[in-house]
Regions:
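Exposed beta-strand-loop-beta-strand "reactive/processing" segments of non-cytosolic proteins
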Residues: 55-104
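Bacterial N-terminal signal peptides
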Residues: 9-18
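N-terminal signal peptide c-region/cleavage motif recognized by signal peptidases
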Residues: 20-22
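Residues embedded in well-ordered secondary-structure elements
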Residues: 14, 28, 69-71
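A short, surface-exposed interaction/processing loop segment used at functional sites
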Residues: 95-121
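Bacterial N-terminal signal peptides that target proteins for export
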Residues: 1-10
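Short, non-transmembrane alpha-helical segments in secretory-pathway proteins
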Residues: 26-62
Length: 121
């Protein structure tokens, strides 16, 4: 049996030619993904919608759980702090117009508190 035969058998049986390769694992808990999505969507709604407001790019980094925007995670939940502004503000170099700090419950399903939503501090 040669490599070509083994490869053909793997394709026929549906087995991976590479063998047991490590798969992608989610290191960010589902509650944290829910939390970043809820925090981002709450800020968008509070600031007039996507036609006039876009949050800082870190609020779209669900695979890293919010990256630099996640400032605290404890028994009270997830706290995010991030800037926002007119659509395209980070890409075109214009200044942000809004800063939002928001705490989401530990399960990621409810807003505990909008701590701050106003001009950048």
């Amino acid at each position: 049996m040669n490599l070509r035969t083994l490869s053909a058998m793997a394709v026929i049986t549906g087995a991976s030619v590479m063998g047991a390769t490590p798969g992608l694992t989610q290191t960010v808990p589902a509650s944290q993904v829910r939390a970043i999505n809820l925090a981002r969507n709450t800020a968008v709604a509070e600031n007039g919608g996507l036609t006039v407001y876009r949050p800082q790019p870190c609020m779209f980094q669900t695979s890293s759980g919010g990256g630099d925007c996640l400032v605290n995670q404890d028994n009270n939940g997830y706290t995010f702090q991030f800037l926002g502004g007119a659509p395209g503000w980070p890409e075109n170099g214009s200044s942000p117009t809004t800063e939002t700090e928001i705490q989401i419950a530990p399960d990621g399903r409810t807003v505990n508190e909008v701590i701050y939503n106003g001009s950048p501090r």
